[in-house]
Amino acid sequence: MKKRYLKMFLILSLIICGLLSVFSFSFTAGQGEAAWETLSQEASDYLEIAINKMEEAIKTYQGANYPNKELWVEAIDYAEKAIEADPDFIEAHYRLAQIYQYTNWYYREAREWGRYIELIQKKEVISPEAEQKLAFAYYRLGYADYQREDYDGCILYLQNAVKVDPENTEAHYWLGRVFYEIGRLNDSLSSWRKVLAIDPHYPRAKYFYTKVGNSIKYGKEAYSHYEAGYNLYEQRLFEEAIYQYRQAVRYNPNFSSAYYWLGRIYYERGNYQEAASNWKEVLRLEPENTKAEYWLKQAEKQLK
């Protein structure tokens, strides 16, 4: 009986060792980074070389990345060979898409992200790391559609990105940009709110949040002209600023801040009559506006 159990134990041990060796190769092939799921040693070797070439290219070219440069040509070649050796090698498609991203080869990048998504979606269980990569793939496809001005496609991909990874700040950022550009201001504001909730210091997020909020309040066209007017005023380009502020009140006759700054420009240029007229408009809309009241008195003093 003991011999029988010993024999069974030895057989099971051999089976387990065999399975572990396959598991180890399938899921940890590569450079000890992400799990690589391939049974092809050739594919794994090619991808390892491709990654090394990519990293060398990044260091060598310092941002001047073009697909015809030697190291990038080699990185692309080895990544493609990895895919030829195993067409379902998920990590190889991901890395090749990255290489195309670095070299600004947008069409091929989009193609590889699409293939990567197809392969990932076939998996029954997706690791947190794979989810982040999937979200990034959706984000890059969304950005590619944005570049082509395919805003419907862009929104769909970006929404998929934040569905997979709600903390994907870049996807929320571009949703905010796209929604603003097509006039969906409330959706844009919601996206900027999410960006700030994830990262309060995300570059320009506060600016866009304020811009969209004011666009909702005053009207997109009116606020766009108002903002342009203020920037021109800061540069002391008064004629151009006057034109922009006048456009702002044309789109929104109740835009008190535009009237206020028109008054300031006319006052600084010595046109006290026009200055007073614009500050009266401010007070008509906002009777308690103390700044307009003060400046109106100053203009009227100059007219006496």
Model-predicted regions and their roles:
Residues 102, 140, 147, 181-182, ...:
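Register position in tetratricopeptide repeats
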